[in-house]
Amino acid sequence: MADRLLGKVALVTGIGAGIGQGVALRFAAEGATVIGCDIVEGAAKATVDAAEAAGTPIQSVHPCDLTVPAEVQRYVDTAAAAHGRIDVLVNAAAIQPHMAPVRDMDYDGQFRPTLAGEVDLVFLTCRAAWPHLVAAGQASVINFASVNAFRGSRQMAMTAHCAGKGAILAMTRQLAVEGGPDGVRANTIAPGLIQTAATAAAGATSGELAGTIAARTLLGRLGEPDDVAWCAVYLASDESRWVTGANFAIDGGVTAA
């Protein structure tokens, strides 16, 4: 076990799979006290079991629906009561976005649920955790944008997803402004296509589409959760103590080409 995050109490949402799982396991391996959550109880338990087997245990509140304010407050209050502080908040949870062209997208059934699952739950968690982050005196918020906050897609119709991730960029910059006087840093990570169960279910990590996207990267492959987790470790650690309001493109070079 390393110790880049030793002594840090970190909330990591969406630990049941994908990037959230990767961040939770990597943070624990780096010495953080991790309190995760997930809406899927079995998935959260599997991550807790994996961390236990690795000798770097984590805790979890599950099931937890982060689109419900009372559930968010329960999660934050549980962590704060158990550990007395919150130093890091990683908003990795998201609801699978609806993909449809703007002409076909239903407002109530597709557009609004996508924004609720990508923007509302980040706002709610930041709001609930904010007093504890301020009290910590030197804290870090890590939110997730996407390459699709910067560019559209010819392969998939993602009007709502692009809107949601663009909103995360803007919200996080404002969080950095508001948090600066209190020592609360806020940054975004904008991943490219990461191989997760969710992206596989969307058909994005295999076949012709995956090949097309991989070919657009400068490194010739799709990303993995740990590629993103290492960046999150840096942003959570004191190594990034003068970094705030920034975005980190972890995309294999897609946005550079």
Spans of features found by a protein language model:
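Short, small/polar-rich loop/turn modules that mediate ligand/substrate recognition or access, typified
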Residues: 138, 180, 185, 243-245
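Conserved mid-core segment of classical short-chain dehydrogenase/reductases
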Residues: 73, 95-112, 154-160, 200-204
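Catalytic Tyr-X3-Lys loop
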Residues: 106-124, 142, 168, 219
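Catalytic loop of short-chain dehydrogenase/reductase
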Residues: 142-167, 172-181, 193
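Short C-terminal tail/terminal secondary-structure segment
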Residues: 2, 96, 100, 232-233, ...
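Canonical Rossmann dinucleotide-binding motif of NAD(H)/NADP(H)-dependent dehydrogenases/reductases
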Residues: 3-35
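Amphipathic alpha-helical dimer-interface segment in Rossmann-like NAD(P)H-dependent oxidoreductases
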Residues: 117-135, 149, 176-177, 181, ...
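C-terminal helical subdomain
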Residues: 177, 188, 211-239, 243, ...
